[in-house]
Amino acid sequence: MSDSSKEKKKKFADMVSRQKGDDQQSDNHKQTDDLNEDLNTLKERAVQLEDHLRRAVADNENVKRIMQKQISDASDYAVTKLARDMIDSCDNLKRVMEILKDGDPVHEGIKVAYQKIINDLKKHGIEEVDPLGELFDSNLHQAVVEREDNEKKPGTIVEVLQTGYTIKNRLLRPAMVILSKKSADCGSD
C-alpha cells in the first residue's frame, strides 16, 4: 500500500472517528437535555406538592382551631338552659324578699339562699346586669316604658323592672328597664 492510500485511509478513519465522537457528543447532549428537562419537571412538581402540603397543613390547623373554639363554646354555654331556669328562681326569691319584711327569719333564710344561688351562678360565668343610672344599651337592655324626668339625661335608666344576666359576656337575658325622658313642658321654657 502506498503512502497516499495509507494517508487517505487514516483521514477516513479519523473522519469516521470524529463523526462517531460527534454523534456520541450529540447523543450525550440530547440525553443531558432530556435529563435537565426531566429534572425541571420534577422540580416544578416538587414545588406544587410543597404548596399543596403547606395548604393542607394550614387547613388542618384552621379546622383544629375552629373545633377547639366550638368545644370551648359548648362547654362555656352548656349551662345556658339551666342558668335560665335558675335566674327565674332568683326572680321569684327576690319577689318573696320584697314582700317579707327585713328582720323576719323567713326573709333572712330566703336572702341567704338567694345569695348562695347568685354566687354559684357567678362561679360559672353568669353575672347580673343591673344598669340603674346607666344609659340605655339595646344590646343589654329592653326598654319597657319611658318616664318623664328632667333631672336625668334622656335615655338614662331610672328603674330596673327585671334584672338582666350575661353568661361569659354573652347576653342571657336583657334587663327590663324604664328610661328617662324630658317632660313635654320642659321644652317650652
Swiss-Prot record:
One Gene Ontology term from the biological process aspect of the record: protein folding
Keyword Signal part of the UniProt annotation: no
TM spans (from-to): none
GO molecular function annotations of the record: adenyl-nucleotide exchange factor activity; protein homodimerization activity; protein-folding chaperone binding; unfolded protein binding
Places the protein is found: Cytoplasm
Ranges where the record places region Disordered: 1-37
SUPFAM superfamilies in UniProt: Coiled-coil domain of nucleotide exchange factor GrpE, Head domain of nucleotide exchange factor GrpE
InterPro entries in alphabetical order: GrpE (IPR000740), GrpE_coiled_coil (IPR013805), GrpE_head (IPR009012)
Alphabetical keyword list: Chaperone, Cytoplasm, Stress response
A GO cellular component annotation in the UniProt record: cytoplasm
Comp. bias regions, Basic and acidic residues: 17-33
Subunit field text: Homodimer.
Protein task: Participates actively in the response to hyperosmotic and heat shock by preventing the aggregation of stress-denatured proteins, in association with DnaK and GrpE. It is the nucleotide exchange factor for DnaK and may function as a thermosensor. Unfolded proteins bind initially to DnaJ; upon interaction with the DnaJ-bound protein, DnaK hydrolyzes its bound ATP, resulting in the formation of a stable complex. GrpE releases ADP from DnaK; ATP binding to DnaK triggers the release of the substrate protein, thus completing the reaction cycle.
Family recorded in the similarity comment: Belongs to the GrpE family.
Name under which the protein is recorded: Protein GrpE
Species this protein is from: Wolbachia sp. subsp. Drosophila simulans (strain wRi)
